[in-house]
């Protein structure tokens, strides 16, 4: 099976699975929804580890290296970088279209005040499920790209709580409700993670999570809405102040 076809099929299956799980858990709010998704990830990790015939168990699966466009494998890392950039631009384009559409405005209304949005006739459940399904589809596509790049798929890593925490931190630190926020968060967390792992080494396994916590505390204290949002607000305040000073 071609990895390109497998990528689309995996995306469709992930979207279907997300629809089912989302329908069962999306009615939960706040920390309860978060706890439900974390618990589900742990259950899936256990199932994946014990389903050795499909996943390779705790050792994972090695992907044979057969370079070529048809095999979605390339000898040059630069080519992978271009393909990854293409995925990023495509994802940002979809996010931008949703953000500027009626669906995007409805999602903002749900985020700000769910009960008020429901009272105004917004189909909260349907839109939440749509957001979850789209997210799962694109996450699956990028997961295929990652597997083709690393040539290795490991269930303990794919379903790890640590990875989920990293993704959440990227969004929170970068700025919720913006497309540029997660990019800024990833640009900060990814090199920080690499540096801390190299600096601390295996002797201090897990200690880097303390640094994540410190970064999160600093952001909550001084940039509560995230880097992107706070920077935009600071720029607007500066422009307003400059205009007032110019008018005397």
Per-region residue spans from a language model:
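Transmembrane alpha-helices and adjacent helix-loop boundaries
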Residues: 1-248
